[in-house]
Amino acid sequence: MKVIKYPAKEEWSEIVKRPHLDVSQLNATVQGVLDDVKNHGDEAVKRYEEKFDHAHLDSVTEAEIEEAEKMVSQELKDALHLAHHNIAAFHHSQKFDGVKVETCPGVTCWQKSVAIEKVGLYIPGGTAPLFSTVLMLATPAKIAGCKEIVLCTPPNKEGKVNPAILMAAKIAGVSKIFKAGGVQAIGAMAYGTESV
């Protein structure tokens, strides 16, 4: 860590300046991955999983979810259930049942909300797994009536998904969980592949 003590006022803007990232090459790389996933499906996702995450595209099994449930402390389970309850209460209060208006005799107009049939959720894993994000995304999707909720999250080096992510997914009613991360996972959910 670089320590700077008592810098001159003229140096402040340079000291706090964020590094500039040239995203031109990054955008081209991302678009290339997305195009490859769109055109080659699972084969492309598997290739990028191995290249970027040193992992294999795979779905999470029921046995893995049961194993994860045993690994999560009771304190965290209780917190996840409480958070799910609170998130659900908030979103249930916003549920819209529609409005019907007879604009003139014999003519009725109405407004109706229809859920997206299938949604994809990307949950970062790694050093700071965002298991609360699972609840905040999957819970309203379930309440809205989405029939299928697909979750992608990168596995660790042993090919395992963080147990708290799996526990949150179970509580929130996620339909399918895939061990996939990065652009390739988002592309798989956006375009669909043979397995995702």
What are these regions, as identified by a protein language model?
Residues 41, 147, 175:
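Short acidic/polar active-site loop segments enriched in Thr and Asp
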Residues 52, 156-157, 184:
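Positions that flank functional sites
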Residues 1-117:
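N-terminal Rossmann-like NAD(P)+-binding subdomain of aldehyde/semialdehyde dehydrogenases
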Residues 101-167:
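Conserved small-residue-rich beta-alpha loop and adjacent elements
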Residues 38, 152, 179:
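Active-site-adjacent beta-strand anchor residues
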Residues 31, 46, 84, 88, ...:
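Predominant activation on well-ordered alpha-helical scaffold segments within soluble catalytic domains
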Residues 173-196:
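Conserved NAD(P)+-binding/catalytic subdomain of aldehyde/semialdehyde dehydrogenases
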Residues 1-13, 163-173, 177:
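Active-site-proximal helix-loop elements at catalytic-domain edges
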